[in-house]
């Protein structure tokens, strides 16, 4: 049985202050959204005009003021500045407070957030970061059983550790992947899979989704048991000039992974991003002023196998986006399911 189509809102913690970010997420429940996800940055992409509220405080604030909205991180790194055992405790508590609504989205991490908070030495290559992620997920899942856990891993250890307040069934873990190796792991071990838009059909239909399928098959799981989430970067506005200009704040996302890998200072990140022309920045986004055109481009991702569409709008006027989403996009998007 195919997964149901879900529509989500990306709460841009790098762009908005804590109170505004909470109010926007609360409003999504009456504007056609099923979920709200939040980024987890210690530092923003931009030094000037940037923000970085604490994701878990945001989740509890939104959880208290909503009734059905699914809430999660997209994504948190439970391996460096966060201890995985403490991360497991935090999400277990939220799972008890908001039953069936909390998930933990995880990734391998970025230097921008970890070096400033005390990581010593050269920033690890992917192999180590991925190994840490896998080990942390194993540990957290053991702790969510509620039993005492003695864990001896390569990176993490616990002695008689137990989480005393755990929701039934634990917490769903969504694994973010930009390539086939981690996507295969998501299919094998994740309750959900997360990727981002704007990188070409071959990545999604030729690499990521087949890898998720392969991982699921190896674990003797159903592909349809995995919630397949994509953050869709969309700048929709009836005014085409505004739709294009709104993407400028998020120029750092258009830097290559190689460019971003070693940058750990938001001032340097901002400088590198602002050297990019607006045309290059906009390539990562669906930039549209016609709702049918916008939804037609979104429909490609559904056709490639994604079912949980989380919309990241780049403009500063998010209330305008929520209204446009409700009137222009949501009715059309629901027909994709």
Swiss-Prot record:
Q: Which residues form a coiled coil?
A: none
- TM region positions: none
Active-site residues per Swiss-Prot or TrEMBL entry? 41, 110
What top-level branch of life does the organism fall under?
Bacteria
> Recorded E.C. number(s)?
1.1.98.2
Q: Name one GO molecular function term.
A: oxidoreductase activity, acting on paired donors, with incorporation or reduction of molecular oxygen
Binding positions for substrate per the UniProt entry? 196, 199, 260, 284
InterPro entries, alphabetized:
F420-dep_G6P_DH, F420-G6PD/mer, F420_G6P_DH-rel, Luciferase-like_dom, Luciferase-like_sf
Q: Which GO terms describe its biological process?
A: carbohydrate metabolic process
Q: Which residues bind coenzyme F420-(gamma-Glu)n?
A: 40, 77, 108-109, 113, 178-179, 181-182
Catalyses:
oxidized coenzyme F420-(gamma-L-Glu)(n) + D-glucose 6-phosphate + H(+) = 6-phospho-D-glucono-1,5-lactone + reduced coenzyme F420-(gamma-L-Glu)(n)
Intrachain S-S bonds: none
Keywords of the record, alphabetical order, are: Carbohydrate metabolism, Oxidoreductase
According to the record's subunit comment, the protein's assembly and interactions are: Homodimer.
Which protein family is it in?
A: Belongs to the F420-dependent glucose-6-phosphate dehydrogenase family.
Purpose of the protein? Catalyzes the coenzyme F420-dependent oxidation of glucose 6-phosphate (G6P) to 6-phosphogluconolactone. Appears to have a role in resistance to oxidative stress, via its consumption of G6P that serves as a source of reducing power to combat oxidative stress in mycobacteria.
Protein name, entry field:
F420-dependent glucose-6-phosphate dehydrogenase
Cite the source lineage: Bacteria, Bacillati, Actinomycetota, Actinomycetes, Mycobacteriales
**Gene encoding this polypeptide?**
fgd
